[in-house]
């Protein structure tokens, strides 16, 4: 691995550590810190990402660009209560964010320059509200040492990235609004397609991979005609395109945008001009307030079925087979939702309110009400299937039920749809938990697989966890599977346990076990979400 930073010129060296992309409707980066796109100084706010303004000479790309606009705590607000469960006081590093944020970074191994290396493009998680491609957890050095180029990127978040409004729809030549964050991701993929060969990468062999919101976005892009031929494979860690709830059309989301303009004091006929002049943080604060009151149940930070970026809901696209025909590696962690439960408890405690302790019946009802709009009769079947366990074990069993209906069922459905489209799917479950005071309460929580995939155990984000040599051993295995898949579409390789491709009759999957071993198993999906192919397509078509 060469550890030099590149500037904006044709590279003379075959080894480049990091690279560019651009600014919120600009893109820069760290390979060369090259503006990939321009987007968010206010005249460009809520518009498609634009090519960067030209410049002469060498553009310094040795430092990372700003994160996109977000809460100053960033992903630290997610990590802090998890560390507290392990008895560690986690220090949140404030995030420096800006609307001038569309940058990408790349790690290129010290291989012959004309090698045509596979490319892995990472979409960070954070509920499409926080995070960036420059998080220490996503350092691509270890993955790139396996003979791949790793690219990470920023995209617009929250109200800057996912905001629909009638005036925006009217000014768009595509009569569309709401998917600016997705457009940034597509712009980054287009940059990779056009430029990565200059750095020894193969533009025809790109794997899009992500975690949580990044995983959801990656699978959503499978349903977008704008991403056609921009990637060949997808790795989806803990996030499914099917988890978006009722179809979110532009018409469904525009009333929230109008309410934001009204709350900002804008005149009805010129809300957009007012909103474009306000500080981004103020617009976000107004929207968050409305979500907490007038628009409860809305998720303002997810993709919109706009007729252009997304002609139909991702679930419908999967059901009809109108998706990008790519190979898929997908899975989830054994106790994804323990992290959100612990985070909610910490937030409630911090607010000064007494801890809410709903009765078991109320917990079950809350679970059913929260999941039924997303998954229809899967919810009722899950409640029936888990009722006895929930009565006996309480919250841990509810954690498991939530994990299955929001995680396992959608992953199995995606694998089935990809397989029916003639491609290969490989499914996993990550069960390894880190020994320590928080283990019993958290288990293999949401995002825990990230340091294993990137081999970033030592970075600040995860430094509070007492990892052992077993964890490092498992990381080496997972790195190999992930990069093998990126190279050929088959994760298997010498010395690795056989990971069988998905078959609907046996549902094979690989467990990254508590002991740190990779163990092949079968029958991935819970019994309540076993549907015939026709029934599954019907259920997805109704989402």
Regions found by a protein language model. Give the residues of each.
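Short, solvent-exposed turn/loop segments enriched in Gly/Ser/Thr/Pro and often Arg
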Residues: 156-159, 209-213, 429-434, 497-503
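Short glycine-biased active-site loop of nucleotidyltransferases that positions the nucleotide triphosphate
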Residues: 142-143, 223-227, 439-444, 501-502
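Bulky hydrophobic/aromatic "packing anchor" residues in well-ordered structure
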Residues: 36, 55, 275, 450-452, ...
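Substrate-gating cap/lid region and adjacent catalytic-acid/histidine neighborhood
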Residues: 233, 241-242, 277, 281-469, ...
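Non-catalytic accessory segments of hydrolases
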Residues: 2-179, 203, 365, 460-478, ...
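Core catalytic loop region at the nicotinamide-binding pocket of NAD(P)H-dependent oxidoreductases
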Residues: 492-510
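Short, internal active-site loops enriched in acidic
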Residues: 125-127, 212-214, 279-282, 432-435, ...
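Serine-hydrolase-like catalytic core of hydrolytic proteins
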Residues: 75-76, 83-273, 289, 308-344, ...
């Amino acid at each position: 691995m060469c550890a030099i930073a590149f500037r904006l010129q044709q590279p003379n060296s075959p080894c480049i550590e990091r690279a560019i992309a651009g600014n919120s409707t600009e893109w820069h980066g760290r390979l060369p810190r090259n503006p990939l796109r321009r987007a968010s100084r206010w005249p460009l706010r809520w518009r498609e990402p634009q090519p960067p303004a030209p410049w002469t000479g060498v553009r310094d790309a040795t430092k990372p660009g700003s994160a996109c606009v977000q809460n100053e705590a960033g992903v630290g607000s997610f990590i802090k209560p998890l560390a507290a469960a392990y008895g560690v006081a986690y220090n949140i590093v404030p995030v420096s964010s800006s609307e001038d944020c569309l940058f990408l970074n790349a790690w290129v191994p010290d291989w012959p320059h004309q090698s045509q290396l596979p490319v892995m493009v990472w979409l960070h998680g954070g509920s499409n509200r926080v995070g960036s491609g420059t998080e220490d957890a996503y350092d691509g050095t270890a993955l790139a040492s396996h003979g791949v180029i790793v690219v990470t990127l920023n995209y617009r978040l929250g109200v800057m990235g996912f905001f629909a409004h009638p005036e925006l729809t009217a000014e768009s030549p595509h009569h569309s609004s709401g998917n600016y964050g997705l457009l940034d991701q597509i712009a980054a993929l287009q940059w990779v397609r056009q430029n990565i060969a200059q750095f020894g990468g193969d533009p025809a062999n790109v794997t899009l991979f992500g975690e949580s919101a990044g995983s959801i976005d990656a699978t959503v892009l499978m349903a977008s005609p704008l991403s056609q031929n921009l990637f060949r494979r997808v790795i989806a860690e803990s996030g499914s395109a099917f988890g978006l709830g009722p179809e979110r059309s532009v018409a469904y989301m525009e009333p929230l945008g109008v309410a934001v303009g009204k709350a900002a004091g804008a005149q009805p006929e010129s809300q957009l001009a007012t909103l474009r002049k306000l500080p981004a943080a103020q617009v976000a604060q107004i929207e968050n307030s409305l979500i907490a009151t007038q628009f409860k149940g809305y998720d303002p930070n997810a993709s919109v079925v706009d007729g252009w970026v997304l002609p139909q809901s991702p679930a419908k696209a999967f059901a009809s087979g109108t998706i990008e025909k790519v190979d898929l590696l997908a899975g989830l962690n054994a106790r994804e939702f323990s992290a959100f439960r612990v985070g909610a408890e910490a937030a409630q405690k911090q607010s000064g309110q007494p801890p809410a302790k709903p009765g078991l019946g109320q917990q079950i009802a809350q679970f059913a009400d929260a999941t039924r709009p997303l998954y229809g009769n899967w919810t009722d079947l899950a409640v029936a299937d888990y009722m006895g366990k929930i009565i006996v074990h309480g919250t841990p069993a509810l954690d498991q039920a939530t994990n299955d209906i929001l995680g396992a069922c959608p992953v199995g459905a995606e694998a089935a749809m990809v397989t029916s489209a003639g491609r290969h799917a490989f499914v996993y479950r990550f069960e390894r938990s880190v020994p320590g005071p928080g283990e019993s309460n958290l288990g293999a929580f949401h995002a825990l697989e990230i340091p294993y995939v990137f081999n970033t155990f030592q970075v600040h984000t995860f430094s509070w966890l007492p990892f052992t040599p077993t964890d490092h051993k498992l990381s080496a295995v997972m790195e190999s599977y992930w990069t093998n898949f990126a190279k050929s579409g088959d994760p298997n390789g010498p010395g690795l346990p056989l990971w069988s491709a998905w078959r609907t009759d046996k549902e094979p999957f690989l467990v990254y076990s508590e002991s740190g071993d990779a163990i092949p198993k079968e029958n991935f999906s819970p019994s309540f979400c076993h549907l015939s192919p026709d029934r599954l397509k019907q259920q997805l078509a109704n989402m």
